[in-house]
Amino acid sequence: MALGEDDILSVPFKYFVFCIGGLPSSALLICVLLSLFLHFDQATSTHCEVANWLPSISAAVSTYTPEKYIWRILIGLHIGPRLVVAVAFRNFLMSSPLRPYTGSKQFKFLCNIACGLNLLENFFLLALTSISSSEDHSLHAKCFGGFAISSIIYMILSTWLFSESGRRRATNLGERSYEYKILGASIFVVCFFLGGYLYWRHNTYCEPGIYTLFALVEYSAVLSNIFFHCTLYYDFHGKNIALTSSFGSSHYNLLPTQIEKDT
């Protein structure tokens, strides 16, 4: 990859997307499979001892080793790029040449709100990863609530801002990204409420297989969240993230190559 005159490092944006999508989805798959193979009885047990064949995400990623270490490492690694991407997407929306001039202050304000919600989502996810339900159930539950609420509001708001900015209509990729954002957000919202219902039903009636359905809905919610954020692949298609000098080369004076001796 060719670098500009003042570029020190240039990374294609698609690699950031692979990172924010590949690391958490791989972590989920690995942890669930390891839980099934190594700790099936413990990971799938329920408080009322009914039949269950899949571990919840909490049981799969935060209770047993090596699952909890794999989850924490991979989620921790992907948080950094997600923070960068959160700010980059804010700037992407605000710099659109097609955004409306009327209400520009309100538009910028909402872009900042969306960016803040995205950052909050990541911090709540990091807290969820660091503090398991077995260590502090109350704090873990609060972090989950914060993650879910900030995720839902961010998905809805950022999708609307993407359309309002004009980026949706700029290219065919923009339209595809918009459609995928709606799909990912819709699945996440449906899974959130369906998961809540199944969890309530399991705790109320203790029916066989209901907790398995709850686990499947949990997996779907996580994957739809990842899918939503991976739509950035289309938004930043062909772009790079570069580390560059804030001064042009013209600001540097070359040292002399020879030193003349006084005679």
From Swiss-Prot:
Transmembrane residue ranges: 16-36, 69-89, 109-129, 143-163, 180-200, 208-228
Key words of the record: Endoplasmic reticulum, Golgi apparatus, GPI-anchor biosynthesis, Membrane, Transmembrane, Transmembrane helix
Q: Name one Pfam family in it.
A: Frag1
Its subcellular locations are: Golgi apparatus membrane; Endoplasmic reticulum membrane
Highest rank taxon of the organism:
Eukaryota
Q: How does it sit in the membrane?
A: Multi-pass membrane protein
Tell me one GO biological process term.
GPI anchor biosynthetic process
User: GO CC annotation: what is one?
Assistant: endoplasmic reticulum membrane
Q: Which family does it belong to?
A: Belongs to the PGAP2 family.
Known function: Involved in the lipid remodeling steps of GPI-anchor maturation. Required for stable expression of GPI-anchored proteins at the cell surface.
Full protein name: Post-GPI attachment to proteins factor 2
Query: From which source organism is this entry?
Result: Caenorhabditis briggsae
